[in-house]
């Protein structure tokens, strides 16, 4: 796995008492609900453009999102550079 988010480990369930901002407090992927795991009930997804290309601009100004993996071009090299970053994001977020 690449290391584009070195200060972020895989996000885990820590329970409602956790003060970790990067922890699941109520979502426990392995907990059974009505005979089925939460992971199977709640199939999370991530939209590629919103995660990897959205500069967070609005009608009041240009975007402020800092994405060091993106050089701002529409080149194939730039597109290919984003792929491992997105997969790392998915893995650390536990999105299958």
PLM region spans:
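N-terminal pre-domain/capping segments
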Residues: 1-96
């Amino acid at each position: 796995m690449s290391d584009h988010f070195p200060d972020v480990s895989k996000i885990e369930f820590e329970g409602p008492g956790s003060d970790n901002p990067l922890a699941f407090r109520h979502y426990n992927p392995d907990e059974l609900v009505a005979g089925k795991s939460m992971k199977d009930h709640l199939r999370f997804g991530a939209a590629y453009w919103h995660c990897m290309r959205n500069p967070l601009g609005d009608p009041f100004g240009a975007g402020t999102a800092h994405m060091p993996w993106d050089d701002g071009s529409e080149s194939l090299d730039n597109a290919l550079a984003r792929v491992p970053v997105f997969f790392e994001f998915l893995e650390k977020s536990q999105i299958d």
